[in-house]
Structures are given as C-alpha cells and as structure tokens.
Amino acid sequence: MIQRRDLTPLFEPRSVLLVGATADTLKWGGWVSKSFGDHQHLRDTHFVSLRGGELYGLPVRTSIADVAAPVDLAVIVVPAPGVPDAVTQSLALGAKALVIITSGFGETSAEGLAVQEALVDEVRAAGAVLLGPNCLGLYDDLGQLNVYGGTFPSGDLAFATQSGNLALEVALLLERSGQGLTRFASVGNQADLTLADMIRDFAHHEASRVVGAYVESPRDGADFADAVREAAAIKPVVVFAGGRTAAGAHAAASHTGNLAAESRVLRAILRDAGAVVVDTPGAFVDAVSTLRTGKTLGRRRIGIVADGGGHGVVSSDTVIEAGLEMATFSAATRDALQPFLKLNAPNNPVDLAGADASVLWHFHGLVDTMLRAEEVDAVVMTGYFGGYGAYHPESGPLEMEVAEAIARSSDETGKPVVVQSMEEASGNDTIRRLREVDVPVFSRIEQAIDALVLLDRPPIVQGVAPAGVPDRTLGDRPAYPEARAALAELGIEFPPGQLATSAEEAAAALDAVGAPAAMKAVAAELLHKTDAGGVVLGVSTPAVAAETFTTMKHRVEAAAGVALDGIWVERMAPSGGVDLVVGARRDPTFGPVVLIGVGGVFVEILDDAVIAPVPTEAAHLAALLRTLRAYPLLAGARGQEPVDCLRVAEIAVRLGDLIIAHPEISEVEINPLRATATGATALDARIVTLG
C-alpha cells in the first residue's frame, strides 16, 4: 500500500506565489492573478513577472529572488524554457507544492520528457510535490483557492481529472442539479502527483462526501485501483472512465484476451475495488447526486408512489428491467396505506391520482408507511411532486413541508427515496429543498431507477490469498493435451479423451472413449480450431473416426499452414446446460484477471462477460454473474434447471490461482465450459505462455 502524501501545502497554503502574473484576463496567468488578488486577504500573495509594476494592489516582482518571504505554493505559468529556473527558485523560497500549468514537456517529445523527469527529481529531493505540468490547476472551495480560472459551484464532491476542460461540463451539470465541488485537481501529465494521490487525499477530506475522477489511462493502473479501493472503504467513489471504444488494443490469442481489453479491464477492476463506474458526464453527475446521500439499498424491493396511472406503469416496467423487484405489500402495510388513497387500491405501484393542496400530506403518509414496512427497501416517487407549487403557488410552502417530512422519514429508516419530477429542470424551491435534504431528484424515470441500482453495491473484496496449485513444468507452447492435464490437476472435470496420431489410432480411440465423440485438431500454433475447420462433432463409429482424421488433417494443415501433432478424440458431453467461457489473463497494467462469459465459441459476438482481479473469492464471482445480461439463462429460464454458478466461479478462481503460480502463463482459457445444475465440464482448453 502506497502511503498517502501530504497535500496540505497544495490545497491549504498559507502563502502563494504566481510566476507569470499579468493583468490580461484573456491569459491563464491573468485568470489566476485575478483570483489570487481577489483573495489576498486569506493568505500572503506574491506576484512575479518580467514587466514588474503592481497588480490588485500588490507589487509585482521582476524576479523570484526578489520575493523576501517564504511561500507554501508556487504556481508557474511561463513558457516551457523558463519553467526549470522558476522551479529551482521557487524551491529555494521554501515552496512545498508547485503547480505547472505550462505544456511542452512529457506529452510532446522525448526531450520534453527528460526535462519533466529532471523537474520531478528536483522537486522530490526538496521534499515538495508537483501538480502537472500541462494541467489546468486546482480548486479548494473552503479556502477559496482557485488556480483553475473558471468558477465552480459549492458542494460536496472532490473531483480529479485527466481532462481539465471536461471539468467545466461536469461543473455546469452539477450546478443544474443543485450540486457542486469541494475540491478539484487537473493532474495533467501526472509527472509527480497522480490521480491515485488525489483520490487518497480526497478520501480523507472531511468536507467531501463523494470522491470523483475522470480517467483515460492511469499512470500506474495497479496503484490507481488500490487508491480507489482504499477510498471506497471510506466514502463513495465515482469514476468516469473514458476511452471505452479505443481501437488500439493488440490482437489477442484467445476469446479471453479479446474480451478483456484494456478499457474493459479498467472498468472491471474499478468496480471490483468498490467504485461506481460511468461512461458519460450526465451519468457521473447522477451518480454523485445519489451517492452523496450516504444511503444504500438493503435488498432490491421497491415501492412506488405515483400521482397518475401512466407514471406508475412506466416506473414499474423500469424497475423490473433494471433487475430490481417490485415490493409485495403485506396485509398490514396495505391497511396502513388505504386511508391515504380514498377509493384507490393499496397496490404497488400506489396511484395517488388527482392530488391537490388538500392531500399533499398524503404523499408523506404513503412514503412513510412504505419506508417503515419490512418488505420495502426503497421508495420511488414519480410524477408531479416537486411541481405543485409551480402550478398552484399557494401550495408551494406546504409542498416544501411535505418534502422535508419525506426526507426525515428516509433518514429515520435509513432507506432511500428518489424522486422523478416533471418539474426537475425548473430547479424550484421544492426541488432545491429535496436535494438539500438528501433526496435526489431526476427528470426521467430511468435516471431515478438507475440511481437505486447504484445504491445496491456489493461488498469490497480484500485480503484474499491465492490457493496453491500442483507443481508442474509447462512446455513453451502447450497444446490441448498438456493444457487439459494441467487443468485436470486443479480438479476441473473433462470428458474421457485420447490423442490419435493416425487414422487407425483415431478408430481405436473412439472405441475407448465411447460415441458420440468430438474430434479436435491439436497443434500449439493452432489458436482457433473452429475457424480452421479443426472441430468435428457427433463422430459415431470407428470408420467415421478414421475417415475424419484423414480429411481433417489435410484440411487444417492446408488452411492454417501448421503441422498437426495429432487429433484429439473425446466423448461428447450430454446436451443441456449453458456453454460458458472461463479464462484468466495476465493484464500488463493490472496483473492477473479472470473472466466468465456466456456463449462458448460465440462469446465475442454476444459480448456478455464479467471480469475480476485475482486472487478473489468464488462467492464474489458468483454474485458478479448476476450482472450478466444472460443471467436468466443461468438462473433457469423457461423451466430449465439453474446452473451451479458457484462451481463455475470456483473453476475461475482455480484458473486465477494457476496463472498466479505460473508467471510464464499469459492466458489460460476453458471454452466452452458446459455448466449444469450439478456441476461443470470443460470441453476445450488452452494455455498460452509468454514469449
């Protein structure tokens, strides 16, 4: 675990120095100059510029050496050639934190990178920290420290980003949703301070209720994931991960490699570390608005209060489609709801149609009753609420009182309430008050339901040790027979099979293993047998086995340009169950990961898989399987028996143990793994070694 760095001089300096000060507010130095000048009463402020003169009533020194007092924070906004000297002189003044806005370093050339690395060495030798270069600064709301230039709404999100301009959009969306920032940092080149450093600092910042980050490529992926895991144990973490469609991934040797591309692994690792991972600025802000409440979803049973039949129907559909459950009210709950409904039935969703000022308190009665019912875990309000004061101004104060009462009920029970209001965009007094008292408000019902899904977060897995594996020396390029033997030693079941090196041996093998059989081409260089015509199913007699051997050998060797080691004859597994791919891969950034996907040979087409770092727990992987789109197949769709998901997860864990124990393995994969109600059988396997 990397130690948290002291960023007090960066975010809470007692004195600041701006190198590159100017009155021109069209320049970055001008923005920062004005901000420092406006807040000079909060800290000692020093300006340096070759022009000299005066700014905001303060003298502008022509040299850093002319600044007599020591400084905590130095901000450098001068052309790249002047940065090294500015850094040296700032450190001589005692600066313990530096921000280099200037670009033209590691992001541009090898020469620029060399200069950047020298700056980092100098800064670290002085016991200081460096933000940047090529960054857009930082912001601290409590101390009114603004090295960003733009303005931010106040709130309780601490946000670090690899894209400074994206922060503007996030800030605008936060403001529209009644939220804001406590701290912000643009990390630029991450030459010294990284996103991970910021996340660790934000996790311990008392004023910040949520930690957020925008990431494309963390400098040290494993450290970034560790920082997220540490922070998520303290407060909610939301990561906006960009680059999910990047096409730069190298060709992989297996389905596991193709599915476990860098962007997917990043997202999976972060989710496993406890973060909520989103793909758009809007989703990021929705997540922050929800998670800042500090509430969680105990189970998945939702009660709905609607003031119109259509809203109730649509919200119910959305709840089910999101994988949540509609709560079934007990008789006692139905009796308690009835007085608020007049002639309407106390069913879920509850329909409070035709409400007016005289019955606004009924909203609270319904919500409070549901929240106090054992069979309800959260409540969704959908329709007009939040807008009655807009339609009937005299109802505004009463609606505000009802909103506050609903929030109190939510706090008293510890159960979340989310609101979908047609008046959300107006930001009226009721909408604003709901947000102030930790009731999230959204304009669309799918946003509200997605918010509840975010609150259903699995526990963070920590401290799992890998299990040992049998000692075995693998060849440089193990073919199927060797891979199968290695996996069988881990307790993974395979059908009976034999290797045939001639047509006669193929016929004898069929007699030995039993019909019907599958025949599969064997060669270390043959990565995808099916594509080369190297798999034939349903071989039923020795004569057919002999003929298949001859034709397959010629076909595959001609199509793939490889010499076969032989053809494997294997008894076919009974039909039924679900075909999966289960694999482990050594990711170059995050280390070993495992993958479970649906579809067998079609797994990449279906694109439905879960990924997790290893070592991990089988129970955790089994729970992750619930997030697959095709999970209903595993759970027993259309009268089928449910699959033994725990056994599937145990096999994935063992593959993870194998790749940890054998650093020479880059990938190991079972595809397909036929999973049934009573276990799982491997029908094909591959081990790929490094080199």
Q: What residues fall within each predicted segment?
A:
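Catalytic-core regions of core metabolic enzymes
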Residues: M1-G691
